[in-house]
């Protein structure tokens, strides 16, 4: 005899109910064992088997294993003083241990590349994570009159050998500054490579300049030399003298088209 729906429901209690759909398969963990792996465009997986890493404070979204986090703020007294004096800096945490660390920043796109005895200059708002083998510091990108008028512009320099992950608002473009004179809105520039020279231009024409056909951008960066500048399709917001993002695997050549 049919027990009826109530009896069948009681009998099925404790049984494992299957979940239908491809949710867990489509979003399964990337099994690559590389040090820095893009789980997807907006989530980075870091294997701690390769040693300690620096990650942006607050960027951890998950981890598996035994990982310890030490918030070192701006990275030591020297960097702290520079951060306070310039208004530019990035708060980082030192990550050690074993396992896999997943980091992200407000669902921004993530770009990964490898530095080999090289250096780059990065907008502090775009720094996400990098190998502990890489040295970093806060530096002034231009000391000219235009930069002084702009209130000073400061970046984070990364130098050495190891992996680097930066964030961008949307898919960026890598411009070869050696092919033609290159200019960009200072608030849209993510980074530039060694060998690139930069000068700051300030549009003092205001509304008249805009009416005459100007860009309407107060601060522009003019690039020369040899190398690449990475530009995102969105501007950062200048807050208190420093740049901050809006509300918030391959080598370097692979990222920049080299």
Task: Show which residues each predicted segment covers.
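N-terminal amphipathic/basic-hydrophobic helices that include classical n-h-c signal peptides
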Residues: 1-16
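Composition-driven recognition of glycine/serine/threonine/acidic- and proline-rich low-complexity segments
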Residues: 14-258
């Amino acid at each position: 005899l049919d027990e009826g729906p109530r009896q069948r429901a009681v009998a099925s209690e404790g049984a494992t109910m299957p979940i239908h759909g491809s949710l867990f398969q489509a979003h399964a963990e990337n099994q690559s064992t590389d040090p820095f792996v893009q789980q997807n465009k907006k989530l980075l997986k870091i294997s701690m088997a390769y040693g300690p890493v620096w990650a942006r404070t607050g960027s951890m979204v998950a981890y598996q294993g035994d990982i310890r986090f030490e918030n070192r703020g701006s990275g030591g007294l020297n960097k702290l003083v520079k951060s306070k004096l310039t208004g530019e800096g990035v708060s980082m945490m030192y990550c050690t241990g074993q396992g896999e660390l997943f980091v992200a920043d407000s669902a921004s796109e993530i770009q990964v590349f490898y530095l080999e005895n090289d250096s780059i200059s990065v907008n502090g708002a775009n720094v996400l994570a990098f190998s502990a083998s890489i040295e970093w510091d806060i530096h002034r990108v231009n000391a000219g009159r235009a930069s002084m008028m702009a209130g000073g512009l400061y970046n984070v320099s990364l130098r050495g050998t190891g992996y680097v992950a930066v964030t961008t608002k949307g898919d960026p473009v890598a411009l070869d500054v050696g092919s033609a004179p290159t200019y960009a809105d200072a608030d849209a520039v993510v980074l530039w490579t060694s060998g690139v020279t930069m000068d700051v231009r300030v549009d003092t024409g205001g509304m008249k300049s805009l009416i005459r056909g100007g860009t309407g951008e107060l601060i522009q960066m003019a690039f020369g030399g040899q190398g690449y500048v990475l530009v995102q399709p969105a501007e950062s917001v200048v807050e208190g003298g420093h740049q901050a993002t809006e509300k918030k695997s391959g080598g370097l050549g692979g990222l920049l088209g080299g």
